[in-house]
Amino acid sequence: MEPGNYATLDGAKDIEGLLGAGGGRNLVSHSSPLASHPAAPTLMPTVNYAPLDLPGSAEPPKQCHPCPGVPQGASPAPVPYGYFGGGYYSCRVSRSSLKPCAQTAALATYPSETPAPGEEYPSRPTEFAFYPGYPGPYQPMASYLDVSVVQTLGAPGEPRHDSLLPVDSYQPWALAGGWNSQMCCQGEQNPPGPFWKAAFAEPSVQHPPPDGCAFRRGRKKRIPYSKGQLRELEREYAANKFITKDKRRKISAATSLSERQITIWFQNRRVKEKKVLAKVKTSTTP
């Protein structure tokens, strides 16, 4: 044998003596080109398996079935070992090519770690889904599969999903009878017609109030005084323009009018006389 071969064997023996039998086997297994290392699966669900396979074992390395929802031609960015914590391998797929599959529930159960700022991929597209009524965009939370709820980035042929939060359209209140109509209870509407007929018609005759509803009436209808009542009031006014309490009680008993009605009539009668005198005065002066 040549001297170079002897030197190589002596160096190997020294290394084996320093590291021990176990260390030498591990070193040889790592340095040997024929050692079979488990390669990180490209597109598959998380699977736990042994980190190293001893060389020369008859059992072939474990192969995982690819996810049926991911196209075979896609090439995602590689993910380092231990990225999501534990001894599991995982893969991150672009959102547009990810479709719902039966393994979604199994993937969502595994815990995940929030990646550091340096480990975030710059080529990953940013996606925001805006919901009506919320000021900020939807932010995905940890420990869930990174799948958008509302599809915003996708192929043109794929169907778009409508908003999951229904928003009722604004409908203004419609008043059938206009603003002049008197609305008492729910469901009461005036019949169509000219507004002056609805305004001057008697509310109690046109629409009788239903049971359990207090009808709000406008101005009370004026009841004219009889000739006998007016004669008694005019006679007292001619005697005294300001009525006293005793006279008011006597007239109230004689005319069947309330004391308030008599007081108001005397006030109106004084105003009327004042207007008549002012009109006569303006007509006589040149």
UniProtKB/Swiss-Prot annotation:
Exhibits both spatial and temporal colinearity within the main body axis. At 12.5 dpc, is detected in hindgut, urogenital tract, spinal cord and tailbud. Not detected in secondary axes such as the limb and the genital tubercule. Residues 219-248, 272-275 are annotated as: Interaction with DNA. Residues 218-277 bind DNA. Keywords: Developmental protein, DNA-binding, Homeobox, Nucleus, Transcription, Transcription regulation. One of its GO terms (biological process) is angiogenesis. Residues 260-275 are annotated as: Interaction with 5-mCpG DNA. One of its GO terms (molecular function) is sequence-specific double-stranded DNA binding. PROSITE patterns: HOMEOBOX_1, HOMEOBOX_2. It is found in: Nucleus. It comes from the Eukaryota. It holds the Pfam family Homeodomain. GO terms for cellular component: nucleoplasm; transcription regulator complex. Heterodimer with MEIS1 and MEIS2. PANTHER family: HOMEOBOX PROTEIN HOX-B13 (PTHR45804:SF6), SEGMENTATION PROTEIN FUSHI TARAZU-LIKE PROTEIN (PTHR45804). Belongs to the Abd-B homeobox family. Sequence-specific transcription factor which is part of a developmental regulatory system that provides cells with specific positional identities on the anterior-posterior axis. Binds preferentially to methylated DNA. This is Homeobox protein Hox-B13. It comes from Mus musculus (Mouse). The lineage of its organism: Eukaryota, Metazoa, Chordata, Craniata, Vertebrata. The gene is Hoxb13.
